[in-house]
């Protein structure tokens, strides 16, 4: 097996290198969440001596569409086998990476895990973490990464705020703009933002948690050319 060269930009590396057990990352579109998740899962699975790892998206199909190809790309030197139908990778140390959907909660039960990535957690039911996934980490004090773009001030926002509480010394919160991805052309992001309302562009590209109040019009929501 050749040495793995983890290729991530500085903002991704800040999350990757964090030694906190639980990490909550609010990131703008095109930040590079999927490549970060893939590298984290590969490394954590290789480091695990007894338990496997999960990647969970809102739906199973989303999990496959988002990460299956990327995982096979970045992990090609350490993958022993790949099962396409179940979206399961077995690595050279016989640890497995499972792609899952939060829309199939029964497939998330009955296992012990060393690591889990919950991608676009804002679009999942909070019970997926609280009642199903959290207990699976208890055996070996497994870790978790919550990552996604905000969707209003829902349970993802609450978790992100709670992760900043100094009394929770095993949690850490992150917030990164799309332009923190140094592989992106910032002019392209600005061009996209120019077609959106201020509030929407803040949420999608600056990863801020916005309150979209129904029935209340705000002048700042409109862009004028």
What are these language model-derived features?
Residues 1-22:
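Pre-P-loop entry segment of helicase/translocase ATPase cores
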Residues 119-121:
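Walker B catalytic acidic pair
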Residues 60-114, 202, 209:
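Inter-Walker segment of RecA-like/P-loop motor cores
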Residues 27, 101, 149, 178-181, ...:
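Active-site donor-binding loop signature of nucleotide-sugar glycosyltransferases
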Residues 20-88, 157-158:
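Conserved P-loop
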Residues 22-24, 52-54, 97, 115, ...:
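Residue-level preference for the first positions of well-ordered beta-strands
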Residues 181-225:
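ATPase catalytic-site recognition across NTP-hydrolyzing enzymes
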Residues 123-195:
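ASCE P-loop NTPase helicase motor core
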């Amino acid at each position: 097996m050749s040495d793995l060269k983890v290729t991530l930009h500085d903002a991704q590396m800040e999350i990757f290198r964090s030694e906190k057990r639980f990490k909550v990352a609010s990131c703008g579109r095109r930040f590079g969440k999927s490549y970060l998740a893939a590298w984290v899962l590969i490394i954590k699975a290789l480091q695990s001596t007894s338990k496997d790892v999960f990647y969970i998206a809102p739906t199973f199909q989303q999990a496959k569409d988002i990460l299956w190809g990327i995982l096979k790309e970045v992990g090609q030197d350490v993958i022993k086998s790949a099962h396409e139908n179940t979206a399961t990778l077995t690595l050279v140390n016989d640890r497995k990476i499972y792609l899952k959907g939060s829309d199939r909660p029964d497939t998330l039960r009955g296992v012990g895990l060393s690591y889990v990535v919950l991608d676009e957690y804002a679009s999942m039911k909070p019970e997926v973490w609280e009642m199903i996934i959290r207990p699976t980490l208890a055996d070996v004090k497994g870790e978790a990464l919550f990552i996604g773009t905000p969707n209003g001030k829902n349970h993802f926002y609450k978790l992100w705020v709670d992760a900043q509480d100094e009394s929770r010394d095993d949690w850490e919160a992150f917030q990164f703009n799309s332009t923190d991805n140094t592989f992106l052309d910032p002019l392209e992001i600005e061009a996209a933002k120019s077609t959106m309302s201020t509030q929407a562009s803040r949420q999608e590209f600056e990863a801020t948690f916005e309150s979209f109040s129904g029935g209340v019009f705000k002048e700042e929501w409109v862009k004028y050319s």
